[in-house]
Every structure is written in structure tokens, then in C-alpha cells.
Amino acid sequence: MMVLPVPVAPWTAALTVLLMVLNKSVVQGRTTPENYLFRAWQECHLTHGRYRYVERYIYNQEEYVRFDSDVGVFRAVTELGRSWADDFNSRKEALEQKRAAPDTGCRHNHELNQRLSQSLIAQPKVHVSPSKGGTLNHHNLLVCQVTDFYPGNIQVRWFRNNQEETTGISTTNPIRNGDWTFQILVTLEMTPQRGDVYTCHVEHPSLDRPITVEWRAQSDSARNKTLTGVGGLVLGLIFLAVGLIMHVRSKKAQRGSR
């Protein structure tokens, strides 16, 4: 069962103001407190595809009259609500509107909210890293950070060498970013062996296919060789760019001297 909000109809809002002035004949013999609270509460219930509308009137935290679409009329909950129920039920046109509220209010607003939520979709961004320097044969924590996604329902799984991991996994609940998007952290306790490939597998309604991000276990020496190779490549590209710039300037200088 889910409960859906329903906007207050104009006539109900006007009636709310009217009800705040309590009928003296109803509360005769009682002293109206200096400060009191009146509340009109509207609910939509959806159960197995069927909508039900409930409207409650509450005075100082005590419900005194109620409309339930399953009943079709207002019913007093306390003695205070008897005259209000009689008055509400005498308003035939307004009563018919209440009886139709499961379709005209609940169903309409639910379908509208669903369309709006489906139009707000953001694909997740996924980043995988160890909590500390990845050393082979040492216990570590692998972190899969999934950010900037909407809606908030998401599935994140861990795989090691194409086999799903089911133990040593911890996850946060989806965390609101302050706008309308979410983020989540899912960690995996592991002791990496040479050649191990860990994969963070993310499924989300915004994606046509899952996002998979890999992290490969490697020794410090292999990592250093990789970094050295990358550094050498970057340095070579820098020298190449400088050489090209000097060559172009030299050509321009030769043309200018002619």
C-alpha cells in the first residue's frame, strides 16, 4: 500500500477557514482555548491497483469527522463531528466530488507524478579505487563510488574474475547531494592476488546497459614500470611539441628575412 498526497480543493480550503470558527452550539459548555490547532488531512491509498480517498478533520490532535470513499459519506468520529458530518452530507454536489476523488484526484495526481519522475533521469558516474595503496597479498578495501544519479533506486554489485562476490560488502543508503541527485558508496573487503580483476557492476533505470568499471591488482614494480612508461611518453610528447614550435618559428623567421 502507498499513500499519495492530494491537493486541497478550493471549496475545501474555504471550508477550512469556516471550520476554524468553532460553532458555539456544538462546543457549548466548553471553553475554547486561546491557542488551538485545526487540521484538514487528505490521503490517497493505492492497494493492488485500487485507489481509496480519505479526508480527516482534526481538532487539537483529535479526529472528529471523516470521509472515506469506501463508505461514501462523512461519518462523525466524536460527538463534536456530528453536526459537521450532517452539514457535509447535505452538500450533495460537494459530496459527489468527494466520491469521485479516487479517480479525479488520486489516480490523476499519481499518474502525473509518475510522468514527472520519469522525465527527471540522470545517469550515474562510477569511480573505483582502493582505500590505500594497492599491495598484493595484503588486506585492503576497494571502494566503488557512484554519484550524480536519479532516481535513487540503484543496484551495485562486485565481481572478482567474473565471479560475483557476496561477502565482505558494505554499502551506504543512497545519499542526497543537495540537489535532486544521489550518490552511494559500496565497499569490498579483499586481499588482491596477482592478476585479479575486480569489477564494480552498476544497474540503474537511466541505463540501457549496466556500467562496469574494473580495477586490476598488480605489484608495486609493475605499477612503477607503468608509471615510468607513462611519464616517458608524456615527456616525449612535450619535447616533440617544443621541437615543432621551434621549427615553425624558424621557418617564419627565414621567410621574414627574404
Curated annotation (Swiss-Prot):
UniProt keyword Transmembrane helix, yes or no: yes
Record GO cellular component, one term: MHC class II protein complex
Domain Ig-like C1-type: 124-212
Main location: membrane
InterPro entries named among the record's database cross-references: Ig-like_dom, Ig-like_dom_sf, Ig-like_fold, Ig/MHC_CS, Ig_C1-set, MHC/Immunoglobulin, MHC_I/II-like_Ag-recog, MHC_II_a/b_N
Cytoplasmic side: 247-258
Domain of life: Eukaryota
Positions on the Extracellular side per record topology: 30-225
Pfam family, one: MHC_II_beta
Disulfide cysteine pairs (residue numbers): C44-C106, C144-C200
Record: glycosylation sites: N224
Region called Beta-1, residue ranges: 30-121
Transmembrane intervals: 226-246
Span of the signal peptide: 1-29
Cell location: Membrane
Record region (Connecting peptide): 216-225
Family under the similarity heading: Belongs to the MHC class II family.
Name used for this protein in its record: SMH class II histocompatibility antigen, beta-1 chain
